[in-house]
A protein has these predicted regions:
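Short proline/glycine-enriched turn/loop segments at secondary-structure junctions
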Residues: 3, 110-111, 193-197
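Catalytic core of non-heme Fe(II) oxygenases with the double-stranded beta-helix
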Residues: 103-181, 200, 214-219
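Short beta-strand segments enriched in hydrophobic/aromatic residues
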Residues: 125, 188, 208-210
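Non-heme Fe(II) oxygenase catalytic core, chiefly the N-lobe of the double-stranded beta-helix
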Residues: 28-34, 68-143
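Histidine-centered metal-chelating micro-motifs
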Residues: 107-108, 187-191
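Non-heme Fe(II)/2-oxoglutarate
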Residues: 1-87, 108, 197-233
Length: 233
């Protein structure tokens, strides 16, 4: 009997966090105020979403109005690590940066990765069913037996790929709803489709760093920040 075996997956974690309308409104109003007080206005273009980390608001985890949300997210981060069979009791887990994004008609978040961290997430604070989707890009293309076979427009037009699926897709669109939380490795290339409606999507993202509590005999993993020393003159 013939069988296909699939190895080396990218595992994306999705959960849902329920907050009261009042709690969500407080955060949304806070985010609008941040947008109004943007520190880097020229960076924002007509086709790109507003991103708080580029506008001087990259530490939402230190804002008391977001405390409950980040406590709930922490629980899901632990669940995510459990699903990967990672012993998080040996790790110190830090929210490094966290920010809001606002996407309106004609705007998107360009493809990017978070190279400075280990785990990233997106929480959808405000979203409707017609909003653009999250996209993940496959950079490894382990099944691509011919270079550019999976992402060549001419190959697609010619019908050489009969059907797109998990075995041959260069990108995956990932549907989400309001209140959804999506967790993934920071190194994963991702972005969003262009928003094509008059709605408004507000999401919260963050970068998470994991350090070894005890680095004795470890070749890899960064040691506890308590052991670091700041350069000084």
């Amino acid at each position: 009997m013939q069988k296909i075996f699939n190895f080396f997956p990218l595992s994306i974690y999705k959960s849902s966090i329920s907050l009261t309308d009042s709690e969500k409104k407080t955060m949304i109003d806070d985010i609008y105020e941040m947008e109004k007080n943007s520190k880097n206005v020229k960076y924002k273009t007509k086709t790109n979403s507003w991103t708080g980390d580029t506008q001087g608001f990259e530490f939402l985890h230190n804002n008391s109005n977001f405390d409950k949300l980040f406590k709930e997210i922490y629980k899901d981060i632990i669940e995510y690590l459990d699903n990967l069979d990672i012993n998080h009791s040996k790790l110190n887990i830090f929210f490094q940066r966290s920010w809001a994004t606002i996407s309106r008609n004609g705007e998107k978040i360009a493809s990017h990765r978070h190279s400075q961290s280990h785990i990233s997430f997106a929480y959808y604070l405000k979203k409707n069913d017609k909003d653009s989707k999250l996209i993940f890009f496959d950079e490894n293309k382990n099944n691509e037996i011919i270079p550019n076979l999976f992402d060549s427009p001419s190959v697609a037009i010619d019908g050489i790929i009969k059907k797109r699926g998990f075995l041959n897709a260069p990108i995956m669109t990932f549907p989400t709803e309001e209140n959804d939380l999506v967790i993934f490795p920071s190194k994963t290339l991702h972005g969003t489709e262009k928003n094509m409606n008059d709605g408004e999507r507000i999401s919260i993202s963050a970068d998470i760093v994991l350090l070894a509590k005890d680095s004795k005999n470890l070749e890899h993993l960064s040691p506890s920040i308590d052991e670091w020393k700041l350069f000084s003159n």
